Design a protein with these regions (language model features):
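Aromatic-Pro/Gly-enriched surface loop or interdomain linker
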Residues: 1-21
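C-terminal, surface-exposed recognition/capping segments
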Residues: 5-12, 26, 31-166
Length: 166
């Protein structure tokens, strides 16, 4: 196993802090913000979907391995619950996809934008999509009662479930 590393918090925003160059040069610094970590000049194209209409495009900033990318929200269409008990007992959901196949998604919560803590870890799942939102980006959200898409500030941290590029 690798060595554990801690993440330093930086609540300061400036012309330098929060840029792509700054984050690449300082991977162990987490930028706290009440807003999007890209601030007013955010770049919605970093994960390949600047207009919200592009599907499954790989970019150099995409955190997925070669041959995979951050999915657009259409990848989650056709998902249905197996059961509420499934989520409550297994810290995740076994989704039925398009009526036949199943796939397990853990409930990992998300790292809150304004605090150094994981919120809702036991019973909610948050998976980033490549779709930009008005104040952040969209994520696929699920718990023991529903599933949907909603926006989350980019200063928050959520899971990424990579999809194979076809």
């Amino acid at each position: 196993m690798g060595a554990q590393r801690s993440v330093t918090a930086n609540a300061t925003t400036s012309a330098e802090v929060g840029t792509v160059s700054y984050t690449i040069s300082n991977p162990d610094i987490r930028i706290f913000s009440a807003n999007d970590w890209h601030n007013e000049w955010r770049n919605n194209g970093l994960w390949g979907n600047s207009d919200g209409l592009t599907k499954n495009v790989k970019t150099v900033y995409d955190p997925c391995p070669e041959g995979y990318c951050v999915p657009d929200q259409n990848c989650y269409q056709g998902f249905t619950f197996t059961s509420k008990t499934e989520c409550d007992n297994n810290y995740g959901h076994l989704f039925v996809i398009d009526g036949s196949q199943t796939s397990y998604f853990p409930t990992g919560g998300y790292l809150d934008k304004g605090a150094n803590k994981i919120a809702y870890q036991e019973y909610r799942g948050y998976q980033w999509t490549s779709n930009p939102g008005t104040t952040g980006a969209y994520y696929f959200y699920y718990n023991n009662a529903n599933l949907n898409f909603t926006g989350l500030d980019r200063a928050s941290a959520a899971s990424v479930r990579c999809v194979k590029i076809e």
